[in-house]
Amino acid sequence: MRITITHTAMLTVLTFALASCVRADSKTGARGESTTGAPAQSAAAAKAADAPKETWRSLLETKTAKGWRGWASPDLPKGWKVTEGVISKDGEVDDLVTREEFANFELKFEWKLGKGGNSGLFYRGTREYDHIYWSAPEYQLLDDANAPDSRSRLTAAAADYGLYPAPADVVLPFDQWNKTRIVVDGAHVEHWLNGKKVVEYELWSPDWTAKVKASKFVKYPNYGLAKKGYIGIQGDHPGTLALRYMQIHELP
């Protein structure tokens, strides 16, 4: 009876050892590398962690606007000022343009206007015409409640000026900060306002071409055709304008 127990115990130990070897072998490859799912997930997580993250850089320094110049001036034009990262103007002044050109990007910033204020943010502008707005699409900045341009949604806040309308009741009242995001990726463009996508269109498409031909831009044959250009801020309207937290993320 004691011998039977001993053999049974030995068989149990051997069975357990063999099972352990089989389990260990299933987890280990020829080079001792794990072949189970969990380590593969860890590798994927590590790869994701090593992947390049979106890099945003500021276009407005805290106390200077060294990345900007006037449309007609090599320096910051009279009437514009920079204070603690906010660039502002009061009255009619020269337009601002970046010193650097941009092709594909996401741009985000906050802006506010005084009562009845009117301005715009231009993208992919060139210098072939007398003004940037004859070459560059424009994200309209407007006090919809009081500015005459709001009579048409084609020229209201966040519209692609003169071509694609933006809906009403998204922009905040004057003297309040609005949040804007603009995506320009190849031919694809998106206008966002206060967390809502309000305009989306394709540059150079048949629809876009037809709209340009029906607009005042038809007199400027290269309007909107540039694939790379300057970002501009319109200054030639009266009233106050302020922008802050302007950052850009360049796309491939």
Regions found by a protein language model. Name each.
Residues 8-19:
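Bacterial N-terminal signal peptides
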Residues 1-7:
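Positively charged n-region of N-terminal signal peptides that target proteins for export
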Residues 21-252:
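Carbohydrate-interacting regions of secretory-pathway proteins
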